[in-house]
UniProtKB/Swiss-Prot annotation:
This is Large ribosomal subunit protein uL30. Belongs to the universal ribosomal protein uL30 family. One of its GO terms (cellular component) is cytosolic large ribosomal subunit. GO terms for molecular function: structural constituent of ribosome. InterPro entries: Ribo_uL30_ferredoxin-like_sf, Ribosomal_uL30_bac-type, Ribosomal_uL30_ferredoxin-like. It comes from Hydrogenobaculum sp. (strain Y04AAS1). Disulfide bonds: none annotated.
Length: 59
């Protein structure tokens, strides 16, 4: 299964762990979209930054 992830909020003022989690997902700018395979690494990083991103499951 794949996930469509969109960065909805900026990283200004966020701690280092949240910035690294967003970068590891391949996101840099607000509004940027990536499509990734669902796996434990991706799910763990999404849990850390769920308030900054929008996630949609693709079939």
């Amino acid at each position: 299964m794949k996930l469509k992830i969109v960065l909805r909020r900026g990283l200004a003022g966020k701690d280092k762990a949240k910035k690294e989690a967003v970068r590891s997902l391949g996101l840099k700018k607000v509004g940027e979209t990536v499509i990734l395979e669902k796996n434990p690494m991706v799910c763990g990083n999404l849990e850390k930054v769920k308030h900054l991103v929008c996630v949609e499951e693709l079939s």
